Amino acid sequence: MDQAASPDDHARYLALRAEVARHNRAYYEQDAPEISDDEYDALARALRDMEARHPEWVEDDSPVQTIGGAPSAAFEPVAHLTPMTSLDNVFDADELREWQEKLARSLNLPPESDDFTFTGEIKIDGLSVNLYYLDGTLQWAATRGNGRVGEMVTAQVLTIPGIPQHLDGLKGQLEVRGEVYLSRADFAAFNAQAEELGTPLLKNPRNGAAGALRQKDPEVTRTRNLKAIFYSLGRRDGVEARTQSEVLQWLAGRGFPVSHYSETFRGYVAAADYHRRMTEARSNFEFDADGTVIKLDPLALQEEAGFTSRAPRWAIAFKFPVEQVETVLESITVNVGRTGKLAPLAHLAPRLIEGSTVSKATLHNEDYIRQMDLRVGDTVVVRKSGGVIPQIMRVVTEKRPEKTTPFVFPTYCPECGHEVTRAEGDANTYCPNPACPAQRFERIRYFVSRGAMDVRGIGEKLVIQVIETGLVRDAADLYLLTAEQLAGLERGGEKKAQNVLAQLEASKTRPLWRLINALGMTHVGERNAQALARAFGSLDALLRATPEQIEAVPGMGKVTAVSVSAALADPTMRNLIERLRAAGMSPEETQTVRGEQLAGLNFVITGSLSQPRDELKALLEAAGARVTGSVTRKTSYLIAGQDAGSKLDRARELAVPVLDEAALGTLLHQRGVQLPGVQASAASTV
């Protein structure tokens, strides 16, 4: 460790590294970012600065030295021919100039050289994909994944308009890279329909695109109206292009959708002007974008400049500034969710931000309101967090009207009047009354939603009607409804009633993960429900599972495992499940295939191996293992290659079994796992 660094400095580094890694997983693997892009950029920049000052702290799995996230075990992993890298960022013209000067030094060129011709492109906020062609025929399409290994999504990508399946006259291997996105218009239309049906809303267009592309059923993907823009080539046999601008022309000539906002210019001053003009125009884009990308135009110079461990030296992302506006906080309401959580909501004087009208913003919890000292009548500064979700940044106290008073958080449920509770150490306040009409409504609405049991025809209005008339108290009562009862409701009718009953009947044999999600357990959404279904295969097996067995499922932490176990053991939950079964609920059981053989095992990889570490990590995770960066008492095995270093010492200190590649092959063979490049051997440990 550097002598100038104190133990506290190193502790702060480890904490920051863990925080950035957590946000990477939320963004790349769970499609659920918790902070805005600019907040993430600030954290990542701080971590890079610390690693630049203390290179002895840096390990291979540093979250700012690696790319993307682990491929999902739900899709077949596929290795890219050439890595799909990330991009480094700049935030103003001075930083752009410094980047050009650094690039000039790496190429042994003067900073003002005429060779510095750049192509500017829009940085679309979507999901990166790679299309692989062999002799002109599309073989597969994959997500970026960790940059080396992605998820096979060929059938899903082929639902996107404008994807050529054949390229006449082309020989050899070709990789075409682009961005899949959900347009702002389709995002708004989806959420408008979801709101009408009472189903979950998409958080932002990027999440919508990622979720649609990762649908197992391509026909579901097709309904989301995804689009794509293509902008680069990886392997490019037979493509005669000398510059990035010629690559874009070649792509357009072959029928690939390309951006109409690309320009070619000379030097960083012109690049900064391009960025300024695109910043002003971004509200007119049909897609969300978080910046521009400035690329060195000559491909020969790109190859000469090369790459760092995570990004090309010849390209940079120039991030858009975050647009902020002032508006007035007109009122604060408190809603009650399906778990009983009280959710405060700010109602704002409508303002236009980045092309859409903002009139509401979440206020999270009581502490958030108190810390910001938010008062009705205040002038507040609002932005779109991550470009989409409205967020109050601060109060303009100098504009505060006289006689305003602090907001008083309710001590009784605004829906049922029951006294609310707040556990020590918990930021959230809850209504503990299970009969609370708001909770009942939200639980039933969630149960029938698109992401749960997907009962079409039961929207928000019908849920309100069946609750208010006393026909339904919980989800199981839905399956006891009769045609006469439904037809007798306002705006009912025989035809509508029969349609609802048919949809309810069809839902009885939905896949197991849908029922798990529909039960509405805390910490369980679509992704965790699918993981639980894959791991346990049947509802009975899940009901018998211990917290330790649940925690062993990839993606589950201890908090989630304890929460799920407690929820499933609750007498009210058990009664609901039994009543659903009595009504004929028989979910389709899930085959426990890949993703279970190594469940419960925690691996750490270190040293030089015969295959890329990222590929081995992805393949182990696809078989159900968890791969982490540090050796602890919870580590099942350390996989050690040449020059293993301090992790090997730590494993021996903790008596963690150590495997070389041959011993790993033996373990995998015994578990029924075949991983390419890993052969079984009689060897056991090193």
Curated annotation (Swiss-Prot):
EC number: 6.5.1.2
UniProt-listed Pfam families: BRCT, DNA_ligase_aden, DNA_ligase_OB, DNA_ligase_ZBD, HHH_2, HHH_5, Nlig-Ia
PROSITE patterns cross-referenced by the UniProt entry: BRCT (PS50172)
Residues binding NAD(+), per UniProt: D37, D38, E39, Y40, D41, S86, L87, E121, R144, E179, K295, K319
Keyword Chloroplast (UniProt): no
Catalysed reactions, semicolon-separated: NAD(+) + (deoxyribonucleotide)n-3'-hydroxyl + 5'-phospho-(deoxyribonucleotide)m = (deoxyribonucleotide)n+m + AMP + beta-nicotinamide D-nucleotide
A GO term from the CC aspect: cytosol
Swiss-Prot/TrEMBL GO biological process terms: DNA repair; DNA replication
Residue span(s) of domain BRCT: 593-681
SMART domains: BRCT (SM00292), LIGANc (SM00532)
Keywords, ordered alphabetically: DNA damage, DNA repair, DNA replication, Ligase, Magnesium, Manganese, Metal-binding, NAD, Zinc
List of catalytic residues: K123 (n6-amp-lysine intermediate)
Essential cofactor(s): Mg(2+); Mn(2+)
Binding-site residues, Zn(2+): C413, C416, C431, C436
InterPro entries: BRCT_dom, BRCT_dom_sf, DisA/LigA_HHH, DNA_ligase, DNAligase_adenylation, DNAligase_N, NA-bd_OB-fold, NAD_DNA_ligase_OB
One MF term in the entry's GO annotations: DNA ligase (NAD+) activity
Protein task: DNA ligase that catalyzes the formation of phosphodiester linkages between 5'-phosphoryl and 3'-hydroxyl groups in double-stranded DNA using NAD as a coenzyme and as the energy source for the reaction. It is essential for DNA replication and repair of damaged DNA.
Family: Belongs to the NAD-dependent DNA ligase family. LigA subfamily.
Protein name per its UniProtKB record: DNA ligase 2
Species this protein is from: Deinococcus deserti (strain DSM 17065 / CIP 109153 / LMG 22923 / VCD115)
Gene: ligA2
